C-alpha cells in the first residue's frame, strides 16, 4: 500500500511512472471561477524541462492535457482538476542490467524491500524526477492563485558544490531590506525559462564550467535551493503537527533528491544567544511586524507576516557513469554496476520550480485549511 497524495483542503495526487504511457495529477479544492493563465503555466513548466548540455538528453513535450476541472479558457469549475502528460521518449532497454541489481543512491532496493518484484523500476518508476512535471502543473496553478491574493514566491540556487550565489536579503526585515528582496525576487521571476536560477551572473558562469567538467568525468553534484514567499498574512497555520513548517517540509520532501530543509536561521540558531535570535517587534503602517526574521516568518507553526523562507539541500543525482558496488537480488552475489540511460549532472537547477511548486501548494492548502481567525481568511 502507498499514497502519493498531499494536502488537507487543497489535495494533490500524483500518478504514473517514468516509463508509463502517461503521468499526471489530480487537484481538489481549487476555487471555482478563478482563471488560470495557461500561457504563463506553460512558461513555468519550461523552467523544469531539460535545455542545457548537462541535462538529460531525454526530451518530453510537457503540454498538459486537462481532462476535467478547467475550461479551454482556463476557468476553474471547482471540481477536481485532472491533467495528463504523455511519456513518448522512453528507452526501457537502458534498465535491463538494473532489473535485479539495485542502483546505489536510488530507491530501487527500498522499493524492492517493500513491493518485491512487482515494483517497476525502469527509469526510476514512480520515484522518478519525471513525476515533478505534474507537480509543477499543480504548483504552477497554485502560484497563480496565491499571486492573485498578494503572495509571491521565488527561489534560486544558493550553492552548488563550492560555488555560492548571492543570498536573499532576509534576516533584516526593515523596509529597505524588503525593497531589496523584492528586486531580487523580481529578477528571478522575470528571467527567461532557460536562464540559470542565480542572482549573480558570475555564479552562473562558474556553474557552467563545473557541470561541463563533471559530465566529462561521468559524475554528479548536489546543491542548496533558497526559497522565499512574501505577502503571507500573519496568523495562518496551526501549532504542533499541522504547523506551517511541518506542511511545507512534507511537500518539499516530495521533490526527489531533497534530503534536508531549514527555516530562517535554521541550524545556526544553535550558535546564537536568545538576545541575538529573538525577532523584536515594531508597529509599521498600523501593523505589528518583526524587525528581524531569524524565525523565517513562522513561530509556533503560524505565520508572523514576515517573509517565509527556507533552504533545502538536494543530494547529487544517483545515476553516475562510474562503476559501483551492488548485489544481485536473485543470486545474492556481489556485482559491479555501471548505470546506463540518460541522466542529469545535477538536479538542483531544474528542481527550483519544483520546490516553488511544493511551497505554493503547502501555502495554499494552509491558507484554506488553517486561516487566520482574526483576519477572516477563508476559502471562498
From Swiss-Prot:
Its EC number is 4.2.3.5. It catalyses: 5-O-(1-carboxyvinyl)-3-phosphoshikimate = chorismate + phosphate. Keywords: Amino-acid biosynthesis, Aromatic amino acid biosynthesis, FAD, Flavoprotein, FMN, Lyase, NADP. InterPro entries: Chorismate_synth, Chorismate_synth_AroC_sf. SUPFAM superfamilies: Chorismate synthase, AroC. NADP(+) binds at residue 48. It comes from the Bacteria. GO terms for cellular component: cytosol. One of its GO terms (molecular function) is FMN binding. Reduced FMN (FMNH(2)). HAMAP family: Chorismate_synth. Belongs to the chorismate synthase family. PANTHER family: CHORISMATE SYNTHASE (PTHR21085:SF0). Homotetramer. This is Chorismate synthase. It comes from Lancefieldella parvula (strain ATCC 33793 / DSM 20469 / CCUG 32760 / JCM 10300 / KCTC 3663 / VPI 0546 / 1246). The lineage of its organism: Bacteria, Bacillati, Actinomycetota, Coriobacteriia, Coriobacteriales. The gene is aroC.
